[in-house]
Regions:
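Iron-sulfur (Fe-S) cluster-binding segments and ferredoxin-like electron-carrier domains
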Residues: 60-87, 118-137, 371-386, 414-425
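Ferredoxin-type iron-sulfur electron-transfer modules and their immediate structural context
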Residues: 1-107
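Iron-sulfur-cluster electron-transfer modules
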Residues: 23, 39-49, 84-287
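Phosphate-coordination loops involved in phosphoryl transfer and adenosine-cofactor binding
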Residues: 194, 320-322, 402
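Conserved beta-strand elements of the Class I
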Residues: 198, 325, 405-406
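Short cysteine clusters
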Residues: 52-58, 62, 110-116, 120, ...
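Catalytic cores of enzyme domains
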Residues: 298-310, 314-336, 349-352, 365-368
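Cofactor-cradling patches in redox/metallo enzymes
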Residues: 123, 204-294, 333-348, 354-444
Length: 444
């Protein structure tokens, strides 16, 4: 029977993890391990595990490893060695206490950014291996409390912020009224069947950032888009269950999202500036549901802005003058390939664009992704210490004249705000839509 792997001391006590561990036995861990490995994995896992030659090339790609002065425990292969390989080596017969560090490593020390996979000579997807560990942890009931609360919200309300149905509709009507002070004829169409576009957002927008809905409504109306938003559950495209390991809820969320679009008979879905939600429809939720492709086309806000500007449906009155640098979200760029379209949009609306180095698919993660920021305040310092290299990257861009950082992803936005304050960078952090709304031509 395996004991806890020797690693750094754990000082964070998480009620979600501690309560789960208290109810574990070695037999239960073994049973869950065998269920996941034998019924939910296959050749992909076997090939990855047996192909790795421990060359260490993945290490130099990892922001956690680089930010911790190349401590091998923070290397991607080190994280897999102390989690999944421990479980595989002992065929799941692990002491309950050993699961604490396994869970903390899987949930809080890997952003699932997949930068390491780009540098692996065999293309091993370590994020997938860590997700297998998270799946086992979820099945054992040892998920960080804050992240589990978000998954509970998804399960109960079909959104991640416990937003009630009437609160959602009230927020849309409120933002419509606010925007009508600027454009009297503006509408946010609800439940309009046959529209060209269903616009979907993530839970924090109606809860904390309603101005983003306002801005989108202005963009849609000025561009003359035939659009709608749903009034029923299915409006939230986010999916933190994807990161907690709750694949069943992940599947429910994706099905509800697409069922809502199908009910409204829209031609396509436009998603707001969110990275993980985008990944959930092109990489994970669709796979769990057995879909080769989404049943209704989905585009990210970056693609939507790109088409509006390229087709001159939105015109720029005057470009944003301050120095701007652009963060490339992992799930949008490394996973979604939207690096050139995001630059087209940025250059179209900003007069002084300063490239961050490295950039595009080689950019460093924000440190919030993969559900790590959703593990809550207890792990904020883990994120800050684990992403010093991102702060250095941002400081270098600032030294070249950047005063504004564009982050076209909600989790990135929040994670970069934390880095900005923690390291005293003094940058203004904006969504692309913030600046597009600011500089676009609007009716008099």
């Amino acid at each position: 029977m395996a004991k806890a792997a020797t690693q750094k001391e754990t000082t964070t006590l998480d009620e979600g993890i501690e309560t789960g561990i208290a109810g574990l036995t070695t037999d239960k861990i073994e049973a869950v391990f065998n269920r996941v490995i034998n019924t939910e994995t296959g050749g992909r896992l076997k090939v990855y595990v047996e192909t790795c030659i421990h060359c260490g090339l993945c290490s130099e790609a990892c922001h956690f490893y680089l930010s911790h002065d190349k401590d091998p425990f923070y290397s991607p292969v080190g994280k897999v060695k102390t989690t999944l390989w421990e479980l595989l080596k002992h065929k799941g017969r692990i002491e309950p206490e050993a699961m604490r560090q396994i869970a903390l490593t899987a949930y809080t020390e890997c952003n699932l950014c997949k930068r390491c996979a780009m540098y692996c000579p065999f293309g091993i997807d370590i994020a997938y291996l860590i997700l297998v560990v998270r799946r086992i942890c979820h099945m054992l009931g040892i998920t960080p409390q804050y992240l589990q609360d978000t998954a509970h919200s998804h399960s109960a309300t079909m959104n991640q912020m416990w937003v009630k149905d009437d609160e959602w509709i009230d927020t849309l009507q409120w933002q419509e009224e606010e925007a009508q002070a600027e454009i009297p004829t503006l509408r946010i169409p609800l439940e309009k069947e046959g529209a060209d576009i269903m616009y979907s957002v993530i839970g924090p927008e109606p809860k904390f950032q309603a101005q983003l809905i306002y801005q989108t409504a202005v963009i849609m109306n000025v561009a003359g888009i035939n659009w709608t938003m749903p009034a029923t559950p299915g409006w939230d495209n986010s999916d933190m269950a994807m990161y907690s390991g709750d694949n069943e809820i992940m599947g429910r969320l994706k099905r509800a999202h697409f069922d809502t679009a199908a009910r409204l008979r829209v031609k396509k879905i436009v998603m707001g500036e969110c990275g993980h939600a985008f990944r959930s429809v092109y990489d994970m939720g669709n796979r769990w549901l057995g879909w080769k492709m989404p049943p209704i086309p989905v585009v990210h806000a970056i693609e939507f802005y790109h088409d509006l500007l390229k087709n001159k449906k939105i015109k720029v009155a005057k470009k944003y003058e301050e120095g701007v640098t652009l963060h490339d979200p992992c799930n949008v760029v490394r996973g979604g390939g939207l690096h050139e379209k995001s630059r087209y949009v940025t250059k179209a609306i900003c007069a002084n664009f300063i490239e961050m180095l490295p950039n595009r698919e080689h950019n460093y993660c924000c440190g919030a992704a993969g559900g790590v920021i959703n593990c809550g305040p207890p792990y904020k310092n883990v994120r800050m210490d684990g992403n010093r290299v991102k702060a250095e990257q941002l400081f270098a861009a600032k030294s070249k004249g950047a005063t504004t950082l564009l982050a076209p992803c909600h989790n990135c936005h929040s994670g970069l705000e934390d880095i900005n304050h923690h390291y005293g960078l003094g940058l203004k952090i904006k969504f692309i839509g913030d600046i597009l709304y600011e500089v676009m031509e609007k009716p008099e």
